[in-house]
């Protein structure tokens, strides 16, 4: 019996700034392109030190951390040879890493999380804020455990789960998910790792996820009806069109486009970082118009950069970014918030930049033939 989609609470984070994002319809940060390979295993490595020795660093292992509560082990590798130190060439993890590093736009690292499948929630929680944003499964399958994982990603709204299956029906139970990406492809080829490696690490705002070539992945020969079914599911295939191998679309299972959600995540991450830096680098930020103006300026600065990166749309008449920033005065804050030195008067809106995915051209031909 399939595990139903259930609501779970997002993970707690150690921070002083909380940016709450709401997407209305219709209407380079480190780590935002990095990939984590999720490797559930019944036998976890034990006795590993969190401190790397010189030989391990020379081998290309970047970091290692064991969660004492769950036994889960998080490791980062700089290249495929480094992955081979811990995973043989015939393992699922190695094959996914191989596909990832085969892409020209891959990151400077790949991460692997070995965890007890019975402790998936707690294991991911321990390493949720580490240096990764996109996750794939070591063994591509859409089963009850995968559904449980998608619940976590949908609750937190700041990481993406990429699932792969050759059976389109596997994704029916996940239809409408915003932070889950479905790839319809033969699982003998690691399209998920190639997909992330080829696109995710490009500058946020600079690219769509459609039309992309994936090294080492074989395009499918699909009928019009088959491709229509994939599109209706909001899944993504790898096809050949006009002599080019390419990804068929660039959306999540909700139909929202990955580049838009990735851009929203960039804005959220950078506003949090900018405001957190202001709180920590200033001796104090006064709870008055001057301090509030400083906070407002920080948010405006991030949104302006997002516009320059083409994350935020441009007003056709003014040429400026379509965004607003509002900062309510101290007088509008509650006595409780003022007493706790908490300011909740900052808000902003923006329109995401769009991308051309298809073109219709209307032409007229003048003929010398007279039709009688």
Task: Locate each region found by the language model.
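Surface-exposed assembly/interface segments
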Residues: 1-372
């Amino acid at each position: 019996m399939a595990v139903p989609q259930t609501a779970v609470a997002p993970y707690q984070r150690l921070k002083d700034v909380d940016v709450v994002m709401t997407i209305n319809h219709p209407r380079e940060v480190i780590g935002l392109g990095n990939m984590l390979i999720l490797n559930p295993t019944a036998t976890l490595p034990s006795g590993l030190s969190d401190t790397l020795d010189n030989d391990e660093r020379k081998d290309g292992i970047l970091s290692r951390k064991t969660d004492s509560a769950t036994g889960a082990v998080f490791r980062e590798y700089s290249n495929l040879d480094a992955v081979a130190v811990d995973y043989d060439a015939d393992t699922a993890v190695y094959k996914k890493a191989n596909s990832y590093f085969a892409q020209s736009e891959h990151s400077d690292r790949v991460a692997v999380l070995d965890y007890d499948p019975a402790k998936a929630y707690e294991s991911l929680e321990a390493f949720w804020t580490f240096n990764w944003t996109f996750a794939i499964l070591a063994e591509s399958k859409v089963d009850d455990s995968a559904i449980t994982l998608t619940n976590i990603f949908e609750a937190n709204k700041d990481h993406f789960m990429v699932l792969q299956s050759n059976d389109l029906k596997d994704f029916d139970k996940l239809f409408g998910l915003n932070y889950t990406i479905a790839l319809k492809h033969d699982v003998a080829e690691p399209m998920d790792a190639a997909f992330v490696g080829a696109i995710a690490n490009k500058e946020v705002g600079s690219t769509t996820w459609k039309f992309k070539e994936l090294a080492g992945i074989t395009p499918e020969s699909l009928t019009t009806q088959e491709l229509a079914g994939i599109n209706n599911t909001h899944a993504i295939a790898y096809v050949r069109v006009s002599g080019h191998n390419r990804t068929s679309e660039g959306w999540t299972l909700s139909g929202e486009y990955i580049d838009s959600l990735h851009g929203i995540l960039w804005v959220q991450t950078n506003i949090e970082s900018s405001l957190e830096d202001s709180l920590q680098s200033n001796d104090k930020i006064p709870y008055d118009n001057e301090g509030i103006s400083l906070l407002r300026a920080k948010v405006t600065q991030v949104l302006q950069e997002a516009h320059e990166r083409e994350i935020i749309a441009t007003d056709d008449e003014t040429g400026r970014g379509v965004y607003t920033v509002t900062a309510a005065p101290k007088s509008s804050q509650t006595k409780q918030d003022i007493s706790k030195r908490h300011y909740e008067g900052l808000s902003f809106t923006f329109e995401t930049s769009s991308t051309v995915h298809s073109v219709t051209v209307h032409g007229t031909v003048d003929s010398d033939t007279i039709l009688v």
